């Protein structure tokens, strides 16, 4: 897929670079100096890939993630099993939600990203991660909105974004729009009719 995009852009006179990835992709306007599979796709439990490049003499490491879609506990909070999508009783405690959430491999993948990213930072790279975490941000599930957006009274320290924040990463959306009441950040399926 990535090769076709690069070839199509080339036909239009645009030079872009990419490398093989299984279920996500990275395109770069700048030549790629290295690429790496950080968390390999295995049994449809997500993946993380990394490229390094130089932008105006500055070293950057860019990661793409498509984390495990199973055990998506934000569905559980809304009365649906996060793996089968069948109706279930709505959990009433944060502990119930997080027990389901950590059954996924999202936390394993993000820990592998953090370990690699720390090496990149130590080697002078600026690090950027994007993609589909298949999990909300803990910065969007706070006391002020616990009774909005089907949060059902819960304030949840979602695992992936909590780990990222604890390791010095910044949620850029929340940095630009710090108020989740005026600028809510939603996670929902791409095929949602809204």
What is each stretch, according to the model?
Residues 1-3, 62-65, 99-144, 172:
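Active-site beta-strand/loop signature of hydrolases that rely on acidic residues for catalysis
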Residues 7, 11, 115, 162-166:
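Charged/polar, solvent-exposed surface patches and flexible loops
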Residues 41-54, 111-121, 125-127, 155, ...:
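Generic detector of contiguous secondary-structure segments
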Residues 75-103, 144-147, 151:
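A solvent-exposed, charged loop/short amphipathic helix patch at secondary-structure junctions
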């Amino acid at each position: 897929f990535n090769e076709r995009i690069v070839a199509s852009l080339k036909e239009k006179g645009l030079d872009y670079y990419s490398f093989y990835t299984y279920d996500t992709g990275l395109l770069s306007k700048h030549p790629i100096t290295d690429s790496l599979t950080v968390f390999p796709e295995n049994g449809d439990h997500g993946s993380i890939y990394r490229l390094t490049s130089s932008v105006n003499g500055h070293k950057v490491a860019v990661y793409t993630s498509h984390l495990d879609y199973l055990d998506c506990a934000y569905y559980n909070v809304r009365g649906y099993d996060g793996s089968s999508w069948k109706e279930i009783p709505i959990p009433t405690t944060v502990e119930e939600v997080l027990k389901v959430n950590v059954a996924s491999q999202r936390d394993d993948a993000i820990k592998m990203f953090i370990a690699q990213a720390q090496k990149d930072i130590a080697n002078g790279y600026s690090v950027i991660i994007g993609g589909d975490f298949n999990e909300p941000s803990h910065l969007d599930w706070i006391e002020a909105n616990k009774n909005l957006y089907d949060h059902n009274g819960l304030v949840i320290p979602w695992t992936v974004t909590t780990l990222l924040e604890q390791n010095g990463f910044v949620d850029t959306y929340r940095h630009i729009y710090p108020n989740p009441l005026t600028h809510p950040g939603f996670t929902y399926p791409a095929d949602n009719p809204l």
